[in-house]
Amino acid sequence: LPADGVHGRWPDKPLEQELRLNKYKIYAAREFARVNGLNRIAIDSPNPRFGIITTGKAYLDVMQALEDMGITGSVAAEIGLRVYKVGMPWPLEPRATHEFAEGLEEILVVEEKRSIVEDQLTGQLYNYPVAARPRVIGEFDEIGRDLLPNLAELTPAMVALAIASR
């Protein structure tokens, strides 16, 4: 980190502030998330194939949807389900995200409003070898049909329907 810190301050020019953001602050924030375990696997399986990545209130909706569907931790392990709880959605810490995605065939991103996590996740997985890259769905499915709307509040029932469709 620079000796004078990373914070925005007067009379720094906007380009100097942007340089600090892109050269230091984003990497420091990602490392903070990694070291403090802000993003974590909440449910795991020994042979995962389907993952759900979620953040905020949507995490509670996912957990309620799974409970409503009768998917307990042992059932999740048996059917190959992995759930990843994101505590800090931006910037999305890539190392733990890659560990989560390892071995998955498909990832369902469940988040409300804007696609903050989904956009970062697809960017982080883009350079995976094609055979190892999981399909990412969320607001839309793999052929562009609406799956989880970003214009309405998600409910456990909506999330359950999205999960069941997979």
Residue positions per predicted region:
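Flexible, low-complexity linker and terminal segments
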Residues: 1-166
